[in-house]
């Protein structure tokens, strides 16, 4: 194969290409002329239609002039502004946006394969939102379960500690009368402490751990803490549930909806433990709309709290007393 090349009008030069063994042996592919169609799954084309930067389908495709790699217009322009002025795929130098060219033919090809691009993107967003919500729900359930386990361990350790203290006090009592008086005085001081511990344990909340570590009364910088006494509604709840008083200490930025969601998940976990169920379906279905939160007002009346109110706002607007705020809960009528 010979080709004549003109060089600046001086004299024509001839250049010969020699075919390789592969080129000599290969046979050309036959053109399809009978209208045959080959079905190709769009999923198999995903790697060809995907932007290497955002890993999503190409949008407003731009092609590099040097290496012919394709990227989304926004992705490659952002990469050139903040990166090393090189192709993210092969690291060839790209001086500026002048090294790129739009590729409308490739965009037209994608629109042929995915005619409803907006519907596809909306479906992707719904799937991602569902996955994110499921993961957040699992993380919340796992956090509450871990809290219950730590609480049980703390109860066991406190029980052993009180047994050891009571045992040592009894031994000292047999040694001398002075030690006997000291042990009696110590037991009298320990009595209210044991009673308070029992009350906190019955509430089912992990508050004593923070108190033992010396951090129970220390609030975060710039964030106030609210102490709550959380009881079932005296008239809207059944009598057997009336003893479920809970003591909570949380951030003042938390809202009433956060409190309702915590209550729904906590009660679902307790019900699951009580019935021995292994499936977390009830926990995942827990919602802040399952319970309504009330605050007592004058003359034994109860006011329904708006879910968007923060606990700090509720305290300033309704409570105004320097003691733990009392709230009441009951199932929402439409969720009964």
UniProtKB/Swiss-Prot annotation:
<dbReference type="GO" id="GO:0031519">
    <property type="term" value="C:PcG protein complex"/>
</dbReference>
<dbReference type="InterPro" id="IPR017907">
    <property type="entry name" value="Znf_RING_CS"/>
</dbReference>
<dbReference type="GO" id="GO:0035102">
    <property type="term" value="C:PRC1 complex"/>
</dbReference>
<keyword id="KW-0963">Cytoplasm</keyword>
<dbReference type="Pfam" id="PF13923">
    <property type="entry name" value="zf-C3HC4_2"/>
</dbReference>
<keyword id="KW-0479">Metal-binding</keyword>
<comment type="pathway">
    <text>Protein modification; protein ubiquitination.</text>
</comment>
<dbReference type="GO" id="GO:0005737">
    <property type="term" value="C:cytoplasm"/>
</dbReference>
<dbReference type="GO" id="GO:0000151">
    <property type="term" value="C:ubiquitin ligase complex"/>
</dbReference>
<dbReference type="Pfam" id="PF16207">
    <property type="entry name" value="RAWUL"/>
</dbReference>
<dbReference type="GO" id="GO:0016567">
    <property type="term" value="P:protein ubiquitination"/>
</dbReference>
<dbReference type="InterPro" id="IPR037937">
    <property type="entry name" value="RING2_RAWUL_dom"/>
</dbReference>
<dbReference type="GO" id="GO:1905295">
    <property type="term" value="P:regulation of neural crest cell fate specification"/>
</dbReference>
<keyword id="KW-0833">Ubl conjugation pathway</keyword>
<dbReference type="GO" id="GO:0033339">
    <property type="term" value="P:pectoral fin development"/>
</dbReference>
<keyword id="KW-0539">Nucleus</keyword>
<dbReference type="GO" id="GO:0048484">
    <property type="term" value="P:enteric nervous system development"/>
</dbReference>
<feature type="compositionally biased region" description="Polar residues">
    <location>
        <begin position="176"/>
        <end position="190"/>
    </location>
</feature>
<keyword id="KW-0863">Zinc-finger</keyword>
<feature type="region of interest" description="Interaction with nucleosomes via an acidic patch on histone H2A and histone H2B">
    <location>
        <begin position="93"/>
        <end position="98"/>
    </location>
</feature>
<dbReference type="GO" id="GO:0061630">
    <property type="term" value="F:ubiquitin protein ligase activity"/>
</dbReference>
<dbReference type="InterPro" id="IPR013083">
    <property type="entry name" value="Znf_RING/FYVE/PHD"/>
</dbReference>
<dbReference type="GO" id="GO:0007417">
    <property type="term" value="P:central nervous system development"/>
</dbReference>
<protein>
    <recommendedName>
        <fullName>E3 ubiquitin-protein ligase RING2</fullName>
        <ecNumber>2.3.2.27</ecNumber>
    </recommendedName>
</protein>
<keyword id="KW-0158">Chromosome</keyword>
<dbReference type="GO" id="GO:1902254">
    <property type="term" value="P:negative regulation of intrinsic apoptotic signaling pathway by p53 class mediator"/>
</dbReference>
<dbReference type="GO" id="GO:0048701">
    <property type="term" value="P:embryonic cranial skeleton morphogenesis"/>
</dbReference>
<dbReference type="InterPro" id="IPR001841">
    <property type="entry name" value="Znf_RING"/>
</dbReference>
<dbReference type="InterPro" id="IPR043540">
    <property type="entry name" value="RING1/RING2"/>
</dbReference>
<keyword id="KW-0808">Transferase</keyword>
<comment type="subunit">
    <text>Component of chromatin-associated Polycomb (PcG) complexes. Component of a PRC1-like complex. Component of some MLL1/MLL complex.</text>
</comment>
<dbReference type="GO" id="GO:0032330">
    <property type="term" value="P:regulation of chondrocyte differentiation"/>
</dbReference>
<keyword id="KW-0804">Transcription</keyword>
<dbReference type="GO" id="GO:0003161">
    <property type="term" value="P:cardiac conduction system development"/>
</dbReference>
<feature type="region of interest" description="Interaction with HIP2">
    <location>
        <begin position="2"/>
        <end position="179"/>
    </location>
</feature>
<feature type="zinc finger region" description="RING-type">
    <location>
        <begin position="51"/>
        <end position="91"/>
    </location>
</feature>
<dbReference type="GO" id="GO:0060042">
    <property type="term" value="P:retina morphogenesis in camera-type eye"/>
</dbReference>
<keyword id="KW-0862">Zinc</keyword>
<dbReference type="GO" id="GO:1905292">
    <property type="term" value="P:regulation of neural crest cell differentiation"/>
</dbReference>
<dbReference type="GO" id="GO:0000122">
    <property type="term" value="P:negative regulation of transcription by RNA polymerase II"/>
</dbReference>
<dbReference type="GO" id="GO:0140862">
    <property type="term" value="F:histone H2AK119 ubiquitin ligase activity"/>
</dbReference>
<comment type="function">
    <text>E3 ubiquitin-protein ligase that mediates monoubiquitination of 'Lys-119' of histone H2A (H2AK119Ub), thereby playing a central role in histone code and gene regulation. H2AK119Ub gives a specific tag for epigenetic transcriptional repression. Essential component of a Polycomb group (PcG) multiprotein PRC1-like complex, a complex class required to maintain the transcriptionally repressive state of many genes, including Hox genes, throughout development. PcG PRC1 complex acts via chromatin remodeling and modification of histones, rendering chromatin heritably changed in its expressibility.</text>
</comment>
